[in-house]
């Protein structure tokens, strides 16, 4: 563990490129962990995941952890129509991410991306990013269904979210993604 003096900033759409490198690092990290179709990550990047997600969502929230003017972690959350989660994931085609009939409203909340540089893990940054994201998601009183999609092989992330109260719902893309839900 390193000695960190972290502060947190909301990343606006105008400043979105400040997390581009970390977003691409997330795709590389997920590929390194994957034991089911790691090649699926080959075409995933800031341009193919972050930008399209921001455009298709009704609301976006990005919070960055910053150490000495360097972004060392971020969390990206969305409020989007549930139909956004039908027919594909980034550059992949699949059935719906979840049973639409099980969702009470037309919109859902999602903790969509979450990444912390290796040297900054297990320092409390993840918990702070998670808590800030959940506070934002829960500020939408009409949204009762929250989802997190965890790539296969990322067991530490899966345990982290389960310890935060999310439950495994099901898998999609033949186990490539595990869907977690708040209820």
Residue map of PLM features:
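Conserved N-terminal entry element of GNAT/NAT acetyltransferase domains
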Residues: 1-17, 21, 25-28
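Conserved GNAT-fold acetyl-CoA-binding loop/helix
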Residues: 28-50
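Conserved acyl-donor/pantetheine-binding loop and adjacent beta-alpha core of acyl/acetyltransferases
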Residues: 79-110
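Conserved GNAT acetyl-CoA-binding A-motif
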Residues: 108-109, 137-151
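Conserved acetyl-CoA-binding loop-helix of GNAT-fold acetyltransferases
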Residues: 113-116, 122-135, 163
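Conserved active-site alpha-helix within GNAT-family acetyltransferase domains
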Residues: 127, 139-142, 152-170
